[in-house]
């Protein structure tokens, strides 16, 4: 599946596959992954959005009995992606941590171990709304925290869509996009990469996150994640 960008503003997505989805923008190749991540092959850069580490701890602190283990599971998922794609740069498009109460001793220990496993990977956090409320991550986590939009090659890295104000091809998160599909008798909502007029919104990476159903407008499309398979939907479908 190719994302063809004939000018600075993206126009259309072509093709489909059951595994990884590749596209091109201004001579660069992007790969949508069924693990809810995006890989820029030439720059060996992995993008994710909305990890929400420590969300379960935040819920438990509020008296909601949510099981633990989601954060360590998600960090292991990230390790697999960084290793399998030999990434040298890791960009989080906002909301790495859920809130201030998420910074538990267990999360700190798990993230430090994760960082040690990937000590040679540059890690950039584009601050999202949850990151701003949670406060700065420990210095030992080794994150370069930046404000949006963060320019990286031809891309404007943001947390919230439209934060780049049309300055370039935008990569964003925040919305946790999903697409609702239905028959006459039943419906299903699946996470997706939402392709809009200014760029691409990534699905939430965190395993303990919700979804927001998007309605495709003319000219928009979605790369839908169904387990380990990806497929494309357009406004007309």
Descriptions of predicted regions:
Residues 1-93, 98-237:
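Extended recognition/assembly regions associated with phosphoester-bond processing machinery
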């Amino acid at each position: 599946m190719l994302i063809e960008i004939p000018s600075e503003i993206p126009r259309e997505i072509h093709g489909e596959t059951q595994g990884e989805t590749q596209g091109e923008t201004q001579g660069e190749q992007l790969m949508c992954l069924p693990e809810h991540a995006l890989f820029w092959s030439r720059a060996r850069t992995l993008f994710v959005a909305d990890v929400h580490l420590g969300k379960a701890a935040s819920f438990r602190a509020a008296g909601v009995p949510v099981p633990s283990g989601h954060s360590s599971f998600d960090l292991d998922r990230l390790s697999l992606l960084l290793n399998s794609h030999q990434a040298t740069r890791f960009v989080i498009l906002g909301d790495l941590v859920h809130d201030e109460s998420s910074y538990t001793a267990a999360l700190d220990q798990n993230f430090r171990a994760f960082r040690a496993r990937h000590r040679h990977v540059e890690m950039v956090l584009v601050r999202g709304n949850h990151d701003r409320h949670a406060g700065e991550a420990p210095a030992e986590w080794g994150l370069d925290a930046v404000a949006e939009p963060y320019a990286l090659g031809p891309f404007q890295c943001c947390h919230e869509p439209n934060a780049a104000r049309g300055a370039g091809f935008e990569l964003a998160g925040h919305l946790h996009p999903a697409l609702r599909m239905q028959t006459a008798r039943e419906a299903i909502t699946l996470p997706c990469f939402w392709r809009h007029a200014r760029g691409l919104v990534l699905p939430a990476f965190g395993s303990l996150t919700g979804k927001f159903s998007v309605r495709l407008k003319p000219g928009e499309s979605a790369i839908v994640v169904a387990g380990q398979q990806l497929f494309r939907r357009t406004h007309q479908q």
